[in-house]
Amino acid sequence: MAAAPWYIRQRDTDLLGKFKFIQNQEDGRLREATNGTVNSRWSLGVSIEPRNDARNRYVNIMPYERNRVHLKTLSGNDYINASYVKVNVPGQSIEPGYYIATQGPTRKTWDQFWQMCYHNCPLDNIVIVMVTPLVEYNREKCYQYWPRGGVDDTVRIASKWESPGGANDMTQFPSDLKIEFVNVHKVKDYYTVTDIKLTPTDPLVGPVKTVHHFYFDLWKDMNKPEEVVPIMELCAHSHSLNSRGNPIIVHCSAGVGRTGTFIALDHLMHDTLDFKNITERSRHSDRATEEYTRDLIEQIVLQLRSQRMKMVQTKDQFLFIYHAAKYLNSLSVNQ
């Protein structure tokens, strides 16, 4: 059995120093983004235009202009608070991980969220991973945007015409979109999977697509690394249903904290040499004989932060990734 990767043996005090470095880097980017620097890589672009206020759940979480998701529209505003994210660590990533990180839909934006899912995922079998409860501490964290199969909750229609911000904020999509409940099942006590059909009301727009909606609302205690076990199962399950070529859509409330933490863990466990060996004992094991000299988790978080602000937002979330990775390694050792 190979030794545990060196970077999961670091002291918390050292890890907090790394988190501070990551945060300081981002502070510099945001200063540049807001000081009028021409052609800044960190420009927030149209996200801060007043007409988009109603499209942002929070006033301080915006996508960078260069990798924001553009809605597929026939006319009008193409803005949604969502970012394309690619994770690819040289020397470790078996293949790149592709995601859309986005805020939890609101009562004004749930229609455009579904239009994004349909048009920005080119293939059938779309996966959405939701890592927030609808309500937390008596505060709405996400609007219940999907049909759950109850009485009068099997079909919804996302309109082709939307104006979340009023008359000056119009968007025209190619078609209305029918969102239809198919079935639901709970996986152990871990998460709930709802299968949904997306059907354009104009058949010329495109085919029916299937969405697999993973609702993981129990992730509350970042001090318990064993909570990575259901996440590990969720990662494997969601990848098995997602069509290769589609990004996995991940959201919490703001689309940065738990979203970033999930994406970091997902790529770590599913697509890196060090941890693919632990979680699957895969055929790639002979490729990881040399110890990786960089801190793999830090490299992943740095990549996430360079593509969407505040990804892995808190110190507890940052530490959780390391503690969870260490816990996974201990499971492998004890097998």
Curated annotation (Swiss-Prot):
Top-tier EC class: hydrolase
Pfam families named among the record's database cross-references: Y_phosphatase
PANTHER family, alphabetized: RECEPTOR-TYPE TYROSINE-PROTEIN PHOSPHATASE, TYROSINE-PROTEIN PHOSPHATASE 1
Location (main, coarse): cytoplasm
InterPro entries linked: Prot-tyrosine_phosphatase-like, Protein-Tyr_Phosphatase, Ptp1, PTP_cat, Tyr_Pase_AS, Tyr_Pase_cat, Tyr_Pase_dom
Reaction catalysed by this enzyme: O-phospho-L-tyrosyl-[protein] + H2O = L-tyrosyl-[protein] + phosphate
The protein's name in its UniProt record: Tyrosine-protein phosphatase 1
Post-translational modification as stated in the protein's UniProt record: Activated by phosphorylation at Ser-83.
The organism's taxonomic lineage, starting at the top: Eukaryota, Fungi, Dikarya, Ascomycota, Saccharomycotina
